[in-house]
Amino acid sequence: MTGSGAAATLKAETNDHHRRAESSPFQRALVAGKLPVDRYVGWLEQMRVLYRVLEAELTLAAVGDRYAALLGTRWRRTPELLADLAHFGRPAEPAPVPATDAFVGQLARWGGEKSAALIGVLYVLEGSTNGSRYIARSLRKAYALDLAGLGYLDPYGDAQTEEWARFKAAL
């Protein structure tokens, strides 16, 4: 499974999960710009915890691995998450909530044995940047923010379409 075949397979395999996630009360409030800012920042903190582990595991998996070329693309989100958290005066190393802790434990297990599962997680997170760009616009108004505080949601700016195409081609 390579290239667009991998992207098509991942899209099909994650479609039901994607629909459920989009219909969750949290996601609906986020998209509508009605999520309280402290809940948004708490979510950023948990994404920081997730990316801390995911980035470490994918970096280890890429050493001599078939995914090394894919992982050469700009997928890391630590810089944006750190900047967003700093904007809101939050710590760079937040503590995980139980659900995040359980998920990052699973990421660590996959890193040791199933790097393809990590690529699936990365596919979902990278794919989410397509819609998160619109969420950033909504939150810009709702929270009276400029770019500061929204870097994680809009990491590529106007290059979003090209970056997503590059990522899928590298799969």
Where are these regions (language model features)?
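Metal- and O2-centered redox machinery and metal/ROS homeostasis
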Residues: M1-L171
